[in-house]
Amino acid sequence: APAMTAEIFRLNSLGFIGNKEVSSRLAVTCRHASVLMASVCKAKGIPCRCRAGFIDFQHNGSVCGDHWINQIWNEQENRWINVDASGYYEYENRFGFSQYDIPNEKFSFSAQAWLDIRSGKVNGEKFVYQDAKGTNGLEATLIYLFLDFHALMNHEIFYSFRPRYVYHGLEQISEVQFQ
């Protein structure tokens, strides 16, 4: 987050403002936007955490793509509110829900997705890691399980930081080892 903030101010000394020239904008992924949002909230004393999971942009539950969001604690409602800081909702009617209060049924947290696949409750192919390889199912969910686990510990690791067996060898893990 400090490096992103420094670059934002380097590109435009006014910092966080709207309607910037394209040359003054910082291109980031949903992960970067989530980390930056959490940093800003925490600096202002607002409880916030990053979460890595899968979102249903199609409205039918058939495909959920990998995505990072934030959860901001709402003291009045006594709940975590799911917020997407990455700005994909410029036309909220297109999605049918607000980026500032994403319904829980639209975002699948990695741990629940993992458990649902393993129990046979859902077809794992619907959870897709958008890596140009079509990675889905348990492999995609396991990748995001590690990312979300670290995010919950305030240690948001980069996409490629994961155990070696996740890259090659997941199919070699026995059912006993999974248990």
Language-model-detected regions and their locations in the chain:
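Cysteine-centered nucleophilic/redox motifs
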Residues: 23-52, 70
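His-Asp-centered catalytic microenvironments across diverse enzyme cores
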Residues: 1, 10, 53-68, 72-179
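Secondary-structure boundary elements
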Residues: 1-24, 36
